[in-house]
Amino acid sequence: VTVPVAVAVLAYLALLPSEEVAPVPGSPCRAGGPARTDPLLAPDLDGDGFGELVYEESADPDGFQVVVVPGSARGPVVGRTTVLNREELGVPDSVQSIDDTWRPTVADLDGDGHLDLVVSGDARVVWGGPDGPRADSPRGRVPLPGAPYHTVPVAGDVDGDGHLDLVAYRFSAKNPALVVLKGPFQRSGAPADTAEIPTPVNEAAFPALLLGDANGDRAADLAVYDSPYDPPLLLTGGADTPSGLSAEPERLPAGESVAFGDFDGDGRRDIAVGQSFVDPYDDEETPYRRGRLHLAYGKEPGTWVTMEGGAPQEGFGTWLGAGDFDGDGCDDLAVQLTRKKEAADARFAVLHGGSEHGLASEPWRTFRRTVAEPSGPVDEGPVDGSLFAAADWDGDGQAELALFGGGHWWFTDGTDRDKASFVEPGRAG
């Protein structure tokens, strides 16, 4: 049984570019003292104070690898890249790889103070150390019950006991389920305990998982989204259940992307849901309407505000990235606009956080990144960069957006300038 979504406030606002953001009297944003409590920094694998760019990629089924690009005061430094291949990661040839660039999970699973890598749907672990993951690093495997698992588990403390847990989705025709593996983890990869939740979505779905604190209680909450058959669902953490997640999920407004952030600077977590109306498989024509952004602020839980953005059929809301892009202490929200999910077109509108009511209703910054001649043997140009992640890769206390497309990476604060950009390692020429 699911809880019906409550939409108490509904407003439709057309989003148009805005050159300046007027300061709001009494704004809760505090430059140098962010209202949020979660770290901005991208995962710092080698402990040098700068976060690394970490991603999985496979140009072909046999080419599965994890790429680690070290961070610096100028952003990722491609000349110091480490590439871990399938053999070094301990991923067997039988494990299915994916075609798209993907994020492995980075988390301290054993509590030794070093970040570890969890890669592939087979949940292989490369244990961290003072110099980060290396080809000769100790390895393990998290035992996942049943099969198959096509995407890497996500990490967060779902039961609030101070140890990071992993959550995975089992794509099984007979018994699809959310699987929660409790920390701390042994060096073999074995969890302290395991619990299963029967799938809350359609059995044919391949949902995405997002762990984050949606309600400010310090326990990680789970968003299950990007199912063409179901609305996004929220399972709150810290529950008195075997898994630590709530027994009944909360239905969120319809949409395909979810982000958590503190957009009004009040110290409470807010939820954003993007609804582009673009068919997930590009089989049907997009209806002649604007995309939507649904927002629920922590100060008014259960109350949703809806804004429309972009022009009709532009796909406003395809992907969302939350982060403080100007260092004022409030999270902002980058919204990707994509006309076709399988096409290489993408533009962005950044909504500024910290106004009297939270996110501004007009874009603060609009931008796109395009490569006219993509690198690699199969890409055809031009290709736009799509959202990969939002984090602080240069240690300046402000988040950057990482975009990837056509073998190119861009790191930007949403303006026309890049803090860093480079061709993907191994694809130049």
Each language-model region and where it sits:
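Beta-strand-rich domains and repeat architectures in extracellular enzymes and scaffolds
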Residues: 33-62
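Acidic/hydrophobic-patterned starts of short beta strands in beta-sheet-rich repeat architectures
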Residues: 47-56, 111-120, 160-169, 216-225, ...
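Beta-propeller domains
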Residues: 203-242, 247-294, 299-300, 310-318
